[in-house]
Amino acid sequence: INNRLHTKFVAIDNRTVYLGGSNIGDYYTTWSDSNLRVDGELGNIFHNIYDFLHGFSHDGNFACRLLDISNLQAGTDRLWLTVPRHQYHIREALMNLINLADKSIYIRTWYFLPDEEMLNALCAQAQNGVQVNVLLSHVTRVRLVDFANHIHVHKLVNAGGNVYRYAGKYMHSKASWNDHGDVLFGSANLDAHSMHINFESCLEIHDSNLTWELRRAFYADLSTSPKQTPESYSNRSFANKALTHVCNLASPWL
């Protein structure tokens, strides 16, 4: 369960990398997911990360000599990692993206269980007039998460955020961006496992053209994604609400 290898990438010939949220298997072909192709020096960096992962032993030790994980940068693009018990830079990068926004924040995520500090940052931005938009999968493969996230969604909606639940089969994308063209794209969900426990990788890019494409895809999915309202929470059954509160207590471990 812990120290899970959750990063997803394909590195080709030391010059091309595909990264994002997609798993490999026939079962996943019907899921809505997002992946990014990057050419250049980052392809070589991901080859080095692949070698680095061979240093991961069964007891969770890393042979850090295989890779300098403190400087994973190509031009203005920066690769951030969550390395269990070592680095939590993806969370720091996401907090910066949220706090630096002036007009809008967009988040696509499979799981939406932000910790208290991150949820408060999103709520504060919404209350300050920043358009906070979150698209999450209404149903995941972990039903406890599906119940627990209702409280997080309810708090953000009450603060003025826009939250949508993807009603297709599964929405597995993981991407965040703001109005400055800052993008964080990769394998990490908004939950404790991705921020602290799994091995994850996310690419930080500054690209207004990419944010335009991501925003276009975001709004295209809203046709099948009901917007959440205060009534979406209050109109649920007593049993559903009770289960939500019980599951929320376990959210730091989900």
Regions found by a protein language model. Name each.
Residues I1-L254:
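Charged, low-complexity intrinsically disordered terminal segments
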